[in-house]
């Protein structure tokens, strides 16, 4: 429910993690 995951760049964070 994090607002950050609602952003279009959320999938990018998955790759960066």
Swiss-Prot record:
GO terms under biological process: neuropeptide signaling pathway
Kindly list the positions at which Serine amide occurs in this protein: 17
Please indicate which superkingdom the organism of origin belongs to: Eukaryota
Tell me the keywords, alphabetical order. Answer: Amidation, Neuropeptide
**Record's protein name:** Peptide hormone 4
Origin species? Periplaneta americana (American cockroach)
